[in-house]
UniProtKB/Swiss-Prot annotation:
The keyword Transcription does not apply. Keywords: Cytoplasm, Initiation factor, Nucleus, Protein biosynthesis, Ribosome biogenesis. Belongs to the eIF-6 family. GO terms for molecular function: ribosomal large subunit binding; translation initiation factor activity. Gene3D superfamilies: L-arginine/glycine Amidinotransferase, Chain A. Binds to the 60S ribosomal subunit and prevents its association with the 40S ribosomal subunit to form the 80S initiation complex in the cytoplasm. May also be involved in ribosome biogenesis. GO terms for biological process: cytosolic ribosome assembly; ribosomal large subunit biogenesis. It is found in: Cytoplasm; Nucleus, Nucleolus. Monomer. Associates with the 60S ribosomal subunit. PANTHER family: TRANSLATION INITIATION FACTOR 6. Signal peptide: none annotated. It comes from Babesia bovis. This is Eukaryotic translation initiation factor 6. Pfam families: eIF-6 (PF01912).
Amino acid sequence: MAIRTQYENSNEVGVFATLTNSYALVSLGSSCNFASVFEAELMPQIPVVQTTIGGTRVVGSVTVGNRKGLLVSSICTDTELRHLRNSLPDSVEIRRIDDRLSALGNVITCNDYVGLIHVDIDRETEEIVEDVLGIEVFRASIAGNVLIGSYCRFQNKGGLVHVKTTTDEMEELSQLLQIPLTSGTVNRGSDVIGGGLIANDWVAFCGMSTTATEIATIERIFQLSRPKEFDPSVSNSHTLRNALIDTLI
């Protein structure tokens, strides 16, 4: 299930939230509806933590994580770090990263097993990513774009990459990640996939402008299927909501 939402008037949901198989972070702000969309779909199985990072709302841009760990930018305050540690599962290791490329969500992207990082990221940061998240990492770019986290999104079963990614490049990345990939867009033609889309292994959240065709591509490549222990009535309500939105955009 891929669910449309927005943060206040922005369709860049990946800028304001981070989603993994064990937790979700959403920006603390005036948009109560944004957090409630995540809570309705994920809780109580997955905690949804409302927070800021360094006093900013761009939580998705300055954090990156998976089910095993969470990396936050050096701008994260001690109070925010303590809040995260008190709110996330004990099994999730949290580390603050001091790197000149501080927008971690734009320069690192990963699933539970492997990650792609900006070609110029510090070697020390690379080692921390591998250690805290428990993954193997590769330096890469997407369709000539070094902001790897902005132009692709993947989880454990598949991934979406920049629409101008070549076939050869996509095949190489697919072999590195060991998952199928396809090129596409979100938010009615936007190629900033990481900004407009977040996903774990059973649900994705995308901007309100995302078309039905884009939704279909997302659901197919990510092989989204709801775990049996989740209440199917919630999924049915979102199906009806998406159908209504399709008639309006």
